Swiss-Prot record:
PANTHER family: TUBULIN
Protein localization: Nucleus; Cytoplasm; Cytoplasm, Cytoskeleton, Microtubule organizing center, Centrosome, Centriole; Cell projection, Cilium
Name this polypeptide is given: Tubulin delta chain
Subunit: Found in a complex with TEDC1, TEDC2, TUBE1 and TUBD1.
Annotated gene: TUBD1
């Protein structure tokens, strides 16, 4: 089944390019770990999901690109065409000559309604090209104006017009130190609206990805391109094909549906994170060897201690003993002793994958009491390696991972709101104080729900 990607704003378009490039690069890499027939099936499954094909055989991304300024879209189209491996559709873009000025209200209340018909028409045409349609993957930032404001508007429209299709939003959490003075306002408005209209929010924190680039990839001067390539690697490791069952020789046909089924059992809990191992520079990789036991031990402890990468894991964090109340349940006033999960999915790719032991992820102590571990944990496998790694593991998790960052953004936004700072920039475009109050209420409920797991 095919996925239509909607790339919104500078952030969404730059990441979208890296994702498609990573997917196609991986699917055409020469892997010595599986037979030719299996490799061809893998390539065909990847293409069906993310690409259509021109008569001359050039793959075309199943994507719609939206921005209110032409510069980034033109750069994105050019980079894809210059790759020689794939390109975007000739009529898959919508751009204007006036941005949203980092104002969520302008993106949501002005640009969104003004260009609704044109944007939704492009999306409809892309959906109609799919023989079998799985849903939408929407890539956007949370803190700006175009990606966040128009992103929230478009997602709401997709929910209205494609209510039976799945919608997953990949959102970029802003740096804690701040890129935009009103980023906390933009963030709470984005999140509260997406929580009503999206089926799942796949969250990447800029601070965490920046640390991966610095500490694991050993990059000295980190660019947005470096960060976006890490994001693309993580997303590719989730969305590339895996077997539907250990005994099956058929790749999963409905990636979005399978992800939602396993990871979002209740509409109150939609926040998903990605952790992957290993992640390192080419130079380090040449001198490294990996075992499944070692990779999974690190991945499990990253989950328990809420670590975003292998380096600096807190090995003292432990789940409570089964049957005992957790002394380390999340409290906003205390350190995170233990990260409780609702659901976890481990995806394993590479050599000897059938020998990997994932029993440690089935421990009932890892999960909230209202879900049986048999329903809360799933594993997908394929012996075909991903990217440059002979063995790799990725964890997609619905857990308490975002409680502290979310509470921090809500509190910062509330402090600004209480002093009426910059409110006029929003009210003049139709976002009233009541809209802010609704957003605060909605997100405070999300924080409380995750805290009480």
């Amino acid at each position: 089944m095919s996925i239509v990607t909607v790339q919104l704003g500078q952030c969404g378009n730059q990441i979208g390019f890296e994702v498609f490039d990573a997917l196609l690069s991986d699917s055409h890499s020469s892997q010595g770990l599986c037979c030719k027939r299996e490799n061809e099936a893998y390539q065909a499954s990847c293409k069906e999901r993310f690409f259509s094909e021109e008569e001359n055989g050039v793959p075309i991304a199943r994507a719609v690109l939206v921005d209110m300024e032409p510069k980034v879209i033109n750069q994105t189209l050019s980079k894809a065409a210059q790759s020689g491996r794939w390109k975007y559709g000739q009529h898959a873009c919508f751009c204007q000559k006036q941005g949203s000025g980092n104002n969520w209200a302008y993106g949501y209340s002005v640009h969104g309604p003004r260009h609704e018909e044109s944007i939704m028409d492009l999306i409809r045409k892309e959906v109609e090209k799919c023989d079998s349609f799985s849903g939408f993957f929407i890539i956007m930032s949370m803190a700006g104006g175009t990606g966040s404001g128009i992103g929230a508007f478009v997602t709401q429209n997709l929910q209205d017009q494609y209510s039976n299709s799945l919608k997953m939003n990949q959102i970029i959490w802003p740096y804690g130190t701040g890129e935009v003075i009103v980023q906390n306002y933009n963030s709470i408005l984005t999140l509260s609206h997406l929580y009503r209209s999206s089926d799942a929010l796949l969250v990447h924190e800029n601070d965490a990805v920046h640390k991966i680039c610095a500490k694991l990839m050993n990059i000295k001067q980190i660019s947005f391109s470096d960060i976006n390539q890490v994001l693309a690697h993580q997303l590719g490791s989730v969305f590339q094909p895996t077997y539907s069952a250990e005994s099956s020789f058929h790749y999963r046909r409905n990636p979005l549906g399978d992800l939602m089924e396993h990871l979002v059992p209740h509409p109150e809990f939609k926040m998903l994170s990605i952790r992957n191992v290993p992640h390192m520079s080419e130079n380090s990789l040449a001198y490294s060897t990996f075992t499944w036991a070692g990779l999974l031990k690190h991945l499990r402890q990253m989950l328990i201690s809420n670590a975003k990468m292998e380096e600096g894991i807190d090995w003292h964090a432990r789940p409570p003993l089964s049957g005992l109340p957790s002394l380390g349940k999340m409290s906003l006033n205390k350190d995170l002793h233990f990260n409780t999960s609702i659901a976890n999915l481990v995806i394993l790719r590479g050599k000897d994958v059938q020998s990997a032991d994932v029993e440690g992820f089935k421990d009932p102590a890892l999960y909230t009491s209202w879900l049986e571990p048999v329903n809360a944990f799933n594993v997908w496998k394929t012996q075909r390696a991903f990217s440059k790694y002979e063995k790799s593991a990725v964890l997609v998790s619905n857990s308490q991972f975002l409680v502290k960052p979310l509470d921090m953004i809500v509190r910062k936004a509330w402090n600004m709101f209480a002093s009426k700072a910059y409110i006029h920039q929003y009210t003049k475009f139709g976002i009233e104080e009541e809209d802010f109050l609704d957003s605060f209420t909605s997100l405070e409920q999300v924080v409380a729900s995750y805290c009480n797991l």
